[in-house]
Amino acid sequence: MTRPGFLVITAVACVLGIAVAAACGHGPNVWTALTTVVLAVLMHAAANVLNDYHDALNGADDANTQGLFPFTGGARLIQNGHVTVQDTHDLAKALILFLIPCGLWLAVQTGGGLIVLGMVGLLLGWGYSAPPLVLMKRGLG
């Protein structure tokens, strides 16, 4: 459900951003940097799980039988009977409920701008395949 192979992209992007900041003279706090990478990866995982959940509800992954795995058709764990739609919903909810207070803590450590970024990330992660936004059907994802 979380599609770990793609989570590496998020981790690399965060580490690159931390490295650029350090090169520009903004040496990172190791704990804050590590927390940033972990939370970014978990947020990406939450978005993937939300996508699998909503695609199962709207039938998008069921209809995608000719897709190029792993790039289309989701993780296929629901479709192959390994997890239920409810399990997927519960994991997405647990990840989000964990991420919100952790993200708020990180924002307090680093500045309020992170709150806006986190809220936009949650909105886009949810809105990618969830109604009423369903951004993927609008060519926005």
Predicted regions and their residues:
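Membrane-water interface at transmembrane helix exits
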Residues: 17, 21, 25, 47-51, ...
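Topogenic membrane-insertion module of multi-pass membrane proteins
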Residues: 1-31, 35
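Aspartate-rich (DDxxD/NDxxD/DxxxD) Mg2+/diphosphate-binding motifs
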Residues: 47-95
